[in-house]
Amino acid sequence: MDDLDALLADLESTTSHISKRPVFLSEETPYSYPTGNHTYQEIAVPPPVPPPPSSEALNGTILDPLDQWQPSGSRFIHQQPQSSSPVYGSSAKTSSVSNPQDGVGSPCSRVGEEEHVYSFPNKQKSAESSPTVMSTSLGSNLSELDRLLLELNAVQHNPPGFPADEANSGPPLPGALSPHYGVPETNSPLGGKAGPLTKEKPKRNGGRGLEDVRPSVESLLDELESSVPSPVPAITVNQGEMSSPQRVTSTQQQTRISASSATRELDELMASLSDFRIQGLEQRADGERCWAADWPRDGGRSSPGGQDEGGFMAQGKTGSSSPPGGPPKPGSQLDSMLGSLQSDLNKLGVATVAKGVCGACKKPIAGQVVTAMGKTWHPEHFVCTHCQEEIGSRNFFERDGQPYCEKDYHNLFSPRCYYCNGPILDKVVTALDRTWHPEHFFCAQCGAFFGPEGFHEKDGKAYCRKDYFDMFAPKCGGCARAILENYISALNTLWHPECFVCRECFTPFVNGSFFEHDGQPYCEVHYHERRGSLCSGCQKPITGRCITAMAKKFHPEHFVCAFCLKQLNKGTFKEQNDKPYCQNCFLKLFC
């Protein structure tokens, strides 16, 4: 760098007396970017460095030996129109036409090597005007500067361990030799005589040494491409030699294209993450392309024809290729969406803190969480075990570690009413080994609800107290009403104590003795009366011997004559007006 600074200072002092008038270069000069419909591929290996010219060659009197070297390839002379201004000797940029098909062959099929033709202006000593002399002097100085820059560039690019002959040999070209064009140098605006053909020299940016101080654009692009994943290895293309303003413009354009491509790819990726369309997920399951992103194939340098030489290559993210198994279920689509979201967020470096593991799918929970039964759940996975509907914020019941919605739990596990067979949701009445709605537990006879006295059961049915005793309690033989408390059992019937009396006089039986006639209890008198066993004379029951006469029964001692009152024991008597008479009294009274 110190040598370069010294050379630049020497050049400035040498050319300080020259007019600052701008010099217009021809359409295609060593300091301009080549044009045409060719695809230019620059060679990363630096051109060979020629030996330094002698002092005579620099003064223009003796041709340098390198000037006598001509390439074996074809040469074409492109005549430039003469102009009134001095034209400096230059050569066109060496353009290598790269054919993609030619690169398929072996290296042996490649013909020739890249030719580097160096042009040094010939200074003819002639007694010409001073402007011509100054122009020639300026051209020689520029040529010397170009040579020194090339030498400096070769020293920087070639490792010190390589020999000079290896550094001077260029790599074989993929195709045929490229045509080179030479521009003849005019000595003066008036002579019109073309000087000897100048050898082509590789163009070199005059400000290359200064740019090497700063980080190169290629290194920045390499860092950018390494930070963005690419499906294929990036092809490194060295920047060609051109003038300083055009080189800066090309590298800036390359950086801008690469940066914009990476930005566009990132935007498309973020947009695809925000969409999460089901169609995209189905394509992921079928192995189709989900997203497409544009990645720069190379530096993105435009071709001389104005067309994008590098272009972009579509990079598609594809899922695992699996045979189609029919339309996926909504649950599987949702799981796929959640898994894709989690993986894509992790790839982008977005940290998601899991709030737990879902008790159903066993995956981490990043969004809303439901906590129930000592576990955490995705809201869409906390569903009823029976109907598979989301429980959400509704009430639920737990049985055997499984959640159930309120409706299914009552239908499956709640007790049933014996009357209506419906589930009992609130209060329950348990009776007769059954469960009942409170409003359905009533008397089977009258339909009245049971009060504090309770109910009575008969044949699996519940009855109120009144209906139960009326229907099933024993009845009193006297009043035919139910016997609820104390009772008397007699004559194969239950009796209220107050109802067990003589059926004729309704007198309670003294000492519990009674007489039965036709299934009814009687006192002794009414019993004998009912049976006809009373003495017609004394009106007392006949307990022993009796005499039956005139359809009546008499004690033997009470069967006497109605007039004389003598006992009729002889067995004969006369009857008159339902009264018995002896024979003597009947004759006396009625004869």
Curated annotation (Swiss-Prot):
Keyword Kinase on entry: no
Bias-annotated ranges (Pro residues): 45-54
Highest taxon of the lineage: Eukaryota
Region (Disordered): 17-138, 156-213, 237-260, 289-335
Protein name as annotated: Paxillin
Motif LD motif 3: positions: 216-228
Location in or out of the cell: Cytoplasm, Cytoskeleton; Cell junction, Focal adhesion; Cytoplasm, Cell cortex
Gene name, Swiss-Prot/TrEMBL: PXN
Transmembrane segments: none
Compositionally skewed regions (Polar residues) per UniProt: 69-101, 121-137
Short name of one Pfam family: LIM
GO biological process, one term: transforming growth factor beta receptor signaling pathway
Locus of motif LD motif 5: 333-345
UniProt-recorded Gene Ontology molecular function terms: metal ion binding
SMART domains in the record: LIM (SM00132)
Motif (LD motif 4): 265-276
Mod. after translation: Phosphorylated by MAPK1/ERK2. Phosphorylated on tyrosine residues during integrin-mediated cell adhesion, embryonic development, fibroblast transformation and following stimulation of cells by mitogens. Phosphorylation at Ser-244 by CDK5 reduces its interaction with PTK2/FAK1 in matrix-cell focal adhesions (MCFA) during oligodendrocytes (OLs) differentiation. Phosphorylation at Tyr-31 and Tyr-118 by PTK6 promote the activation of RAC1 via CRK/CrKII, thereby promoting migration and invasion. Phosphorylation at Ser-250 by SLK is required for PXN redistribution and cell motility.
UniProt organism field: Pongo abelii
